[in-house]
Swiss-Prot record:
UniProt record, GO biological process: L-histidine biosynthetic process
Organismal lineage: Bacteria, Bacillati, Bacillota, Bacilli, Bacillales
Name of the molecule in the record: Histidinol-phosphate aminotransferase
Alphabetical keyword list: Amino-acid biosynthesis, Aminotransferase, Histidine biosynthesis, Pyridoxal phosphate, Transferase
Summary of subunit composition and partner proteins: Homodimer.
Record organism: Geobacillus sp. (strain WCH70)
Length: 365
């Protein structure tokens, strides 16, 4: 048997350590996970009731078109139902886009470092990857435009960017979209959209009326707290959605996930509360960094990337042994940094205490 050439040597996605894994490995009982940008407050209480109602129907296939969720999201966004495509997380919508647009003899343009699934799925389709280095942690939009040619099919903007938390503002984005050729799909991945509070963070849904080659990705995994249920979606023109729908797997979002997402979307008060707490948590980390002379990127997401000036794996291991899971920057393109999810007030205080002790022990302050 012979697999596709591009799969040879392509590593599978490596998730961070789970809480149970750390408990077993280190004999610890009190673990906090601040590695995967999950919502530390969970999901809306209304979600649990919605999920329970679905438990009597587990033998029945889900609605493959996600009609009720589609209606709810369309109303929430002010778009037509036919402008939406749903996925098993927005990761799957990334996969659908790559399936639909990329092949050998095409190329795709993206920042580096950024969310790794753009590259991963493009490699599987045999496309050339054109990675444009970040400048000061931000997308270099001019260089990305210059990398586009006749064979380019997709350009990706992660906004806010993962792992830096930086963002492309409204003026920068509209200037960029004006110059993206019509044969290139511009994908705006807004997984952390709900957390962005900057006054000039772009409101992109209205831009769909101007740009037929624009697609926006969003998810219920982050602010909505449904990471375990895997549901995300893409927003684009009716024509574009119709053309890529054949690349979507049938029944790709479960009945439980659809019901949970509807309930989560209904509770915007919960989202507002989480966003405010996240903003306060970021300020706590900013103060810690500034008091200790540490470099960081101001974030529009629910995480912060901090440069400690030593191996990120060393910081990761120090925290792991104390029951705190973060993400080492070694795997993210920032070898002397770690990415920390903003937790609850108590979680933030615990990790900052541990990091302060580390800085003292390693004589970094």
């Amino acid at each position: 048997m012979e697999i596709k050439t591009q799969l040879r040597g392509l590593p599978p996605y490596q998730p961070g350590k789970s809480i149970e894994e750390v408990k077993r490995e280190y004999g610890l009982t009190d673990i906090i996970k601040l590695a995967s940008n999950e919502n530390p407050y969970g999901c809306s209480p209304a979600v649990k009731e919605a999920v329970m109602k679905q438990l009597d129907h587990l033998a029945i296939y889900p609605d493959g078109y996600a009609r009720l969720l589609r209606e709810k999201v369309a109303t929430h966004l002010g778009v037509n139902e036919t402008q939406l495509i749903f996925g098993n997380g927005s990761d799957e919508v990334v996969q659908i886009i790559c399936r639909a647009f990329l092949s050998p003899n095409t190329n795709t343009v993206m920042a580096a470092p950024t969310f790794p699934q753009y590259r991963h799925n493009a490699v599987i389709e045999g496309a050339e990857i054109r990675e444009i280095p970040l400048v000061d942690g931000r997308h270099d939009l001019e260089a990305m435009l210059n990398a586009i040619d006749e064979q380019t099919r997709v350009v990706w903007i992660c906004n806010p960017n993962n792992p830096t938390g930086t963002y492309v503002n409204e003026q920068e984005l509209t200037s960029f979209l004006e110059r993206v050729p019509s044969h290139v799909l511009a994908v705006l991945d807004e997984a952390y959209y709900e957390y962005a509070t900057a006054n000039d963070y772009p409101q992109t849904v209205p831009l769909l009326r101007q740009y037929d080659n624009l697609m926006i990705l969003r998810t219920f995994s982050k602010a909505y707290g449904l990471a375990a249920l895997r549901v995300g979606y893409g927003i684009a023109s009716e024509t574009l959605i119709r053309e890529i729908e054949p690349a979507r797997e049938p029944f790709n979002t479960s009945s439980v996930a659809q019901a949970a997402a509807i309930a989560a979307l209904d509770d915007q008060a919960f989202i507002r509360e989480c966003v405010e707490k996240n903003k306060q948590g970021l300020e706590t980390f900013y103060r810690f960094c500034e008091e200790n002379g540490l470099r960081y990127y101001p974030s529009q997401a629910n995480f912060i990337l901090i440069d400690f000036g030593i191996e990120g794996n060393e910081v990761f291991q120090y925290l792991l042994e104390r029951g705190i899971i973060v993400r080492s920057g070694n795997a993210l393109g920032f070898p002397t940094s770690v990415r920390i999810t903003v937790g609850s007030k108590e979680q933030n205080e615990r990790i900052i205490h541990a990091l302060t002790q580390m800085l003292k022990e390693k004589q970094l302050i």
